[in-house]
């Protein structure tokens, strides 16, 4: 049975994600920008939290961990490489490790770039991937610690997941990301359609997260740095893929 997903808005533009196994009653949360909205979502559904999964150490993803742990007794799991700057971990994780939510098994994927210790969680039976600030709707995270090459390789890992995977990223950034993408390829029919869809969703107050990986592969410029059409659009026809990615990231940082 697939996990039930609840997207919980936090702060001004963050998301936490509750995942619930109806068969066992077990519930986990991925990232905790603040505890209040997560506790409210749990109470509304009568769910008990047993596990907190963390993608990376930034405060807008972990600030609510201690309050939530104190209120629920949930254990906390995060990257072993970042244990020294995450809230105290009950379980340290690395590439290929498995986490469980009830009967569902998720795999840890190391995705350095935004931070050097960033990880993602892929639950194949539910077609869910929790990517934090690595792969995002129409974008990717800024390179605060890692290199462009590292982030490009991380994005390639994520783009190799099944295309039906739902990408649960950590922020509501799609509208800005889409406007930027349109500056690179203003005449792309697929991009025009997606920009319009995102704008309509936000006008109606609907989240753009999660997004389909197939849509990201088709329209997210940060996943398409190896495509000839995008290389031509940025004037880097003969450049290496990671160099094109770095240029797109540089332009987005100034957008």
Curated annotation (Swiss-Prot):
Cofactor binding note from Swiss-Prot or TrEMBL: Binds 2 Zn(2+) ions per subunit.
Positions contributing to Zn(2+) 1 binding: 56, 58, 114, 133
E.C. number: 3.1.2.6
Domain of life of the native organism: Bacteria
InterPro entries: Clx_II_MBL (IPR035680), Glyoxalase_II_hydrolase (IPR050110), HAGH_C (IPR032282), Hydroxyacylglutathione_Hdrlase (IPR017782), Metallo-B-lactamas (IPR001279), RibonucZ/Hydroxyglut_hydro (IPR036866)
GO biological process: methylglyoxal catabolic process to D-lactate via S-lactoyl-glutathione
Family: Belongs to the metallo-beta-lactamase superfamily. Glyoxalase II family.
Cofactor(s) it depends on: Zn(2+)
Record carries keyword Zinc: yes
Protein name stated in the entry: Hydroxyacylglutathione hydrolase
Biological role: Thiolesterase that catalyzes the hydrolysis of S-D-lactoyl-glutathione to form glutathione and D-lactic acid.
Organism whose genome encodes this protein: Cereibacter sphaeroides (strain ATCC 17029 / ATH 2.4.9) (Rhodobacter sphaeroides)
């Amino acid at each position: 049975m697939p996990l039930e997903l609840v997207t919980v808005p936090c702060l001004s533009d963050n998301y936490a994600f509750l995942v619930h196994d109806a068969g066992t009653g077990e519930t986990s949360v991925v990232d905790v920008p603040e505890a209040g909205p997560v506790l409210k979502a749990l109470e509304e559904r009568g769910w008990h939290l047993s596990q907190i999964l963390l993608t990376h150490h930034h405060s807008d993803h972990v600030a609510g961990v201690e309050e939530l742990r104190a209120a629920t007794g949930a254990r906390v799991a995060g990257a072993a490489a970042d244990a020294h700057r995450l809230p105290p971990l009950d379980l340290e994780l690395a590439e290929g490790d498995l986490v469980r939510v009830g009967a569902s098994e998720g795999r840890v994927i190391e995705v350095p770039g935004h931070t050097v210790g960033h990880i993602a969680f892929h639950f194949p039976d539910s077609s869910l991937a929790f990517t934090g600030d690595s792969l995002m709707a129409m974008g990717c995270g800024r390179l605060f610690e890692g290199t462009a090459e590292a982030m490009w390789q991380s994005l390639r890992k994520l783009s190799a997941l099944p295309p039906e995977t739902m990408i649960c990223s950590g922020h509501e950034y799609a509208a800005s990301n889409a406007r930027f993408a349109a500056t690179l390829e203003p005449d792309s029919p697929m991009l025009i359609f997606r920009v319009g869809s995102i704008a309509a969703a936000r006008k109606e107050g609907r989240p753009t997260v999660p997004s389909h990986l197939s849509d990201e592969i088709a329209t997210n410029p940060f996943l398409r740095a190896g495509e000839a059409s995008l290389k031509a659009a940025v004037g880097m026809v003969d450049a290496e893929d990671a160099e094109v990615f770095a240029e797109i990231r540089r332009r987005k940082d100034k957008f």
